[in-house]
A protein has these predicted regions:
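Terminal low-complexity tails and localization/encapsulation signals of metabolic enzymes
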Residues: 1-36, 69, 73
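Glycine-rich loop-to-alpha-helix module at the N-terminal edge of alpha/beta enzyme cores
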Residues: 30-113
Length: 113
């Protein structure tokens, strides 16, 4: 069974208010399901934007050193899981695996910059 992904809003995982999901498949084999994603409504999106605005002031007061630490943590996670992300890109987009690995590597480098 395909994994069902949720939205992350205001520090919590949540489904779409409609309860609906959208299924993503492999373009080369429509029977091969990648996962199910929340079919978010405009209200769901507006709630996420509102939550982001609510924490903007707190984030602004976060030191540049702490912000950099978050980016480095994200880079480390992405780098440690490069193969998983590259395989996902290859399955979903048909991208060559070497190209997908390179794309992940460039994302890691950007986060580390």
């Amino acid at each position: 069974m395909a994994e069902r992904y949720q939205n992350y809003v205001n520090g919590a995982w949540t489904g779409a208010s409609s309860g609906s999901v959208s299924t993503s498949t492999i373009p080369a084999d429509l029977s091969d399901v990648i996962g199910e994603f929340q079919a978010s409504t405009s209200g769901d999106v507006n709630a996420a934007i509102s939550a982001a605005h609510d924490v903007k002031e707190s984030w602004r007061r976060t030191s540049s050193l702490a912000r950099g630490g978050y980016l480095l943590k994200a880079a480390s996670y992405l780098e440690a899981n490069t193969e998983e992300f590259a395989q996902a890109l290859t399955r979903e987009c048909g991208k060559a695996i070497l190209e997908a690995r390179g794309e992940i590597g460039r994302a890691v480098a950007l986060l580390q910059y």
